[in-house]
């Protein structure tokens, strides 16, 4: 689910922390991708013209494999070395969110039964999309045949992606979930696995610039995320993004905010949830269950052409000519290796408050300018 309203806060207060770039800008980068989120996207977006999921004659869904194969190829074509991270066992605190999703699913199934209009049916069907263990297993098998490394995280995939980026194994974590920032990935890439047809630039969020711009510590930023609403516990009803940021800045921590509310100084406008496990949620962000990066060896291998054709073409009925063309692209891209970028020789220099304020003002002015060209950075 991510963090409600966090993207809006960053866009409003620190737009300079977000760089919109073409995929070519990440040539030579290694990136850790949230596999579960990507598979969900593929199941939602990769469809036939009538809106139905791609499938074999026997009814087996193949949208996830089509998306995984061709979106990964696009990255390889542009000099990116992807590795995928799959979710492990969800933390106990997440049962709160999983229960909510289960309840919503029951409601959606009812709406689907009642739907008469075809467009409404497709809308409700998309809401019922769920990544199954079979989808995950098939995606892992495909990645193995493609020669693309993958990891199964002990817990949350976003946390493991962030850890790989923090430890320098990869440049950035890629996910649509904004809570990846709470695990303090240096950079978060959004829209990386979107289709080329969408023409959506990749959004690169610099975590350090976000913290500087909001004038928050990492711990305070995590507390802000919990107040906005995360997967691990409910939020305080009635407190939206503007108020949440104001309270964190004024009081500095959730402990102080809870004390402020329960003392009656907030005029009883809000009520803290009973037995609110905000500290446990905080620890899941600050000290997540991840594999030590030193124990992970990311290696990109030559694709297994014969088995790829057998799996995708003979078993899943993909177009053989297109798959063979894709394999050639894969062989070429993986053979070339990761080229060294010139900016890799230079240490990142933190921006001063004045520089950050100037950049933020410039970014805000650009957003307000009419007749935007829509061009993205090529770096």
UniProtKB/Swiss-Prot annotation:
Record-listed E.C. numbers: 3.1.-.-
Top-level taxon of origin: Eukaryota
Annotated DNA binding sites: 47, 71, 156, 229, 231
Cofactor stoichiometry and binding remark: Binds 2 magnesium ions per subunit. They probably participate in the reaction catalyzed by the enzyme. May bind an additional third magnesium ion after substrate binding.
Region (Disordered): 360-379
Residue ranges with Basic residues bias: 364-379
Residue ranges, annotated region (Interaction with PCNA): 338-346
Localisation per UniProt entry: Nucleus, Nucleolus; Nucleus, Nucleoplasm; Mitochondrion
Tagged with keyword Ligase: no
S-S bridge residues: none
Post-translational modification: Phosphorylated. Phosphorylation upon DNA damage induces relocalization to the nuclear plasma.
MF terms (GO), sorted A to Z: 5'-3' exonuclease activity; 5'-flap endonuclease activity; DNA binding; magnesium ion binding
Biological-process GO terms, alphabetical: base-excision repair; DNA replication, removal of RNA primer
Keywords assigned by UniProt, alphabetized: DNA damage, DNA repair, DNA replication, Endonuclease, Exonuclease, Hydrolase, Magnesium, Metal-binding, Mitochondrion, Nuclease, Nucleus, Phosphoprotein
Positions of the UniProt region annotated as N-domain: 1-105
Cofactor needs: Mg(2+)
Summary of the function given for this chain in its UniProt record: Structure-specific nuclease with 5'-flap endonuclease and 5'-3' exonuclease activities involved in DNA replication and repair. During DNA replication, cleaves the 5'-overhanging flap structure that is generated by displacement synthesis when DNA polymerase encounters the 5'-end of a downstream Okazaki fragment. It enters the flap from the 5'-end and then tracks to cleave the flap base, leaving a nick for ligation. Also involved in the long patch base excision repair (LP-BER) pathway, by cleaving within the apurinic/apyrimidinic (AP) site-terminated flap.
Assembly mode: Interacts with PCNA. Three molecules of FEN1 bind to one PCNA trimer with each molecule binding to one PCNA monomer. PCNA stimulates the nuclease activity without altering cleavage specificity.
Protein name in the entry: Flap endonuclease 1
Source organism (scientific name): Zygosaccharomyces rouxii (strain ATCC 2623 / CBS 732 / NBRC 1130 / NCYC 568 / NRRL Y-229)
């Amino acid at each position: 689910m991510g963090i409600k309203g966090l993207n809006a806060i960053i866009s409003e207060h620190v737009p300079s922390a977000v760089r919109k770039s073409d995929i070519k800008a990440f040539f030579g980068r290694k990136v850790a991708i949230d596999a579960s989120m990507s598979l969900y996207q593929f199941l939602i977006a990769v469809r036939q013209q009538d809106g139905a999921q791609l499938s074999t004659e026997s009814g087996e869904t193949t949208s996830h494999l089509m998306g995984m194969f061709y979106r990964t190829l696009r990255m390889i074509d542009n000099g990116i070395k992807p590795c995928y991270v799959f979710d492990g066992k969800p933390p106990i605190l997440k049962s709160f969110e999983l229960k909510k999703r289960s309840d919503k699913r029951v409601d959606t199934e009812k709406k689907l039964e009642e739907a008469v209009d075809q467009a409404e049916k497709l809308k409700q069907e998309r809401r019922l999309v769920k990544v199954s263990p079979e989808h995950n297993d098939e995606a892992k098998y495909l990645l193995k045949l493609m020669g693309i490394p993958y990891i199964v995280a002990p817990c949350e995939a976003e946390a493991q992606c962030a850890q790989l980026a923090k430890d320098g194994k990869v440049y950035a974590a890629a996910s649509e979930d904004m809570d990846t920032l709470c695990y303090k990935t240096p950079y978060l890439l959004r829209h990386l696995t979107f289709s080329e047809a969408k023409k959506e630039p990749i959004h690169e969020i610099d975590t350090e610039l976000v913290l500087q711009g909001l004038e928050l510590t990492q711990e305070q930023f995590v507390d802000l995320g919990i107040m906005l609403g995360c997967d691990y516990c409910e939020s305080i009803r009635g407190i939206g993004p503007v108020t949440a940021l104001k309270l964190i800045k004024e009081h500095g921590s959730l402990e102080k905010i809870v004390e402020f509310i329960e003392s009656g100084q907030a005029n009883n406008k809000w009520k803290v949830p009973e037995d609110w496990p905000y500290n446990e949620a905080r620890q899941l962000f600050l000290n997540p269950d991840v594999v030590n990066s030193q124990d992970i060896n990311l290696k990109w291998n030559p694709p297994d052409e014969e088995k790829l054709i057998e799996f995708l073409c003979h078993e899943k009925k993909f177009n053989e000519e297109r798959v063979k063309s894709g394999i050639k692209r894969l062989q070429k891209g993986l053979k070339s290796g990761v080229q060294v970028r010139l900016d890799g020789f230079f240490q990142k220099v933190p921006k001063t408050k004045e520089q950050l304020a100037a950049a933020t003002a410039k970014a805000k002015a650009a957003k307000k300018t009419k007749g935007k060209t829509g061009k993205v950075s090529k770096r």
